[in-house]
From Swiss-Prot:
Keywords: Cytoplasm, DNA damage, DNA excision, DNA repair, Excision nuclease, SOS response. InterPro entries: GIY-YIG_endonuc, GIY-YIG_endonuc_sf, GIY-YIG_UvrC_Cho, Hlx-hairpin-Hlx_DNA-bd_motif, RuvA_2-like, UVR_dom, UVR_dom_sf, UvrABC_protein_C. One of its GO terms (molecular function) is excinuclease ABC activity. PROSITE patterns: GIY_YIG (PS50164), UVR (PS50151), UVRC (PS50165). It comes from Pseudomonas syringae pv. syringae (strain B728a). This is UvrABC system protein C. Interacts with UvrB in an incision complex. It holds the Pfam family UvrC_RNaseH.
Amino acid sequence: MTQTFDPGAFLATCSGRPGVYRMFDAEATLLYVGKAKNLKKRLASYFRKTGHAPKTGALVSRIAQIETTITGNETEALLLEQTLIKEWRPPYNILLRDDKSYPYVFLSDNAFPRLSIHRGTKKAKGRYFGPYPSAGAIRESLSLLQKTFQVRQCEDSYFKNRTRPCLQYQIKRCKGPCVGLVEPEVYAEDVRHSVMFLEGRSNALSDELNASMEKAAMALDFERAAELRDQVALLRRVQDQQSMDGGTGDVDVVAAFVNPGGACVHLISVRGGRVLGSKNFFPQVGIEEEVGEVMSAFLAQYFLGGIDRELPGEVIVNVINDDFPAFVDAVEELRGVEMVISHRVRGTRARWQQMAVTNAEQALTARLANRQHVASRFEALAKVLGLEDPPMRLECYDISHSSGEATVASCVVFGPEGPIKSDYRRFNIEGVTAGDDYAAMHQALTRRYSRIKAGEGKLPDVLLVDGGKGQMSMARDVLNELQVPELILLGVAKGTTRKAGFETLYLNDSAHEFTLPGDSPALHLIQQIRDEAHRFAITGHRARRGKTRRTSTLEGVAGVGPTRRRDLLKHFGGLQELSRASIDEIAKAPGISKKLAESIYANLHSE
């Protein structure tokens, strides 16, 4: 593709039918995918001499080839466009950076049903409620249900092996069905009430609970009446916090907001008239910077991209676009759902719409302000380090362990826009003396920079080490051993008071020692990155330590490998319950012989 692209010659043979077009650069890299009702007319608009946005002009200047695919109609073009965008993720397209499944509340189908969070395919027998826009929203609902109706949320394996009620019973978050502390019909009633709440029938539920409360009071069952009173009070509190008069339909409210710094789409999920929660999306804005184009791209990628996602019957938007009819047809063709897109709404729906618009504007404003704040800190750090330009990539390392147990090293990465979490890494440290932080850091840096030297990852401009002269010298030794190209090495040691704002800094070698004022933006950036590395290391260490403590007592038993160990713990609901089991009870577990049960029992009860 070395020849110059000739738009006139291309357009002379281009079809005027609906279809999809793909733009490539001279290296055959796909730059952009688009759709059109009339391919020739749409593509001709790119080659006008005036009226282009800067990003469109940049795209056109790189075009070396255009390929087209004619489709039967606009709907087919939309579906093909989304398939290609999802597969290739072209740099000039609006891209939705959210491809994970959304959580549901799952109610199991057994004698004493369990409420839990579920993601992925719906294989288990039971009922699913949702989807919820975030894990936080679903946890909030489950917490409320646990307080109000005390339906169990424990794993079935844990439930089946209880011999006495757990802590959840003591704090009134469960009625103890595992040990027979609640009658099946009473528990079933609590489950029915939970279902009413999850279906959005809170008003009917409140009326029913009020009637039951009055009935209990008339029967002088004041304990039951007080319990029902508390349930009604909790429900009223939720109703006061949410817009509840929107009917019983399922609605998603979507608002898009665009300014020169980026775009935000705010989505509110309403199921059965109840607001389940909301979520912000910050799509990568391509050449289409108009708010209507952002909305159109979001709807197509969000609703057509997740095949396992339940679709609402109505989507309320704050802007309209000519692509909406094709989108609605595509939803019906691909998913078999009749969807209505509403723009002019009244009453509660109008309040939801305005709420989404306000949240989108505020979220983008806050994001851009934070980005500007971080960028100013990077500029301040550049001055401190004597650099002409701010560094583009900072890495910081930290070590976490408990008296040498389960040592974990962390690596966090920051850029001018904030943390780059996709590049975070943890290292489980092995084969070093317990508590030897220098050896642990040496191993982590060696593993990290050996991979970078091999082409896996990017070198930072600044390497930040949480430690004093010893850690600095060790880091310099690793870089020299691996012949890593010159980069800035910055050590951060706590001052004599060990308080924030009094850190001692070491630049490149331990001889260059200095401090910064407590109000220095550069120091604030260093503290932010160091604290993030510390947090990331601690969470990794705690997870590793917990896993080790759960399984280490079984690791020495011959015949109990990782799979059997996992199955055994799942069968008994944890190590504590397994420790309480007799030899005969252990032998009843799948795949465990009497002889192996004796070995397990002896191992668990050895001093």
